[in-house]
């Protein structure tokens, strides 16, 4: 049986990619995705370059750190801060597309988790939820378009995670906004199969090169 290659995994984006809200580092996305890949036989080298509060416009510095490694597989989580700061969706999507294209040009495979549906966060007033939900959905659609155009893989998080988070407040941290450790487990469970598929595709291509 052919040994799977070592893979350099990087996490880019905002507080979701960083892990804000989790009680322990091993509960965050990076270690959870690393564990999923390791269980599949990969030797994973993890780097988390995500910055809490980052917008899509500020991804450039993180991308430069990733391409300097260079990264093999990048997971990008971005959009929540663009929505919170009322960045026009077209501008946020354009910046995400630019970041994705730069990572691809440097040889990395890219998985982008689209903006979450923030309307289900307990901190969001009920009266504002329809507007917030619509804004999140609009950004998610544009993100998917630009990521696919740039050669990345889209992981849609909006509707599926909204159902889980909207019915279980234990998935939120004490700030009622960021995920808890249990919340990150739900997100990682959605992302891990997609990340594994991309890693397997990369390994298959490398084995025939």
Feature-to-residue mapping (PLM):
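Cell-envelope and extracellular/periplasmic
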Residues: 50, 54, 78-79
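Alpha-helical cap/lid subdomain in secreted, periplasmic
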Residues: 60-209
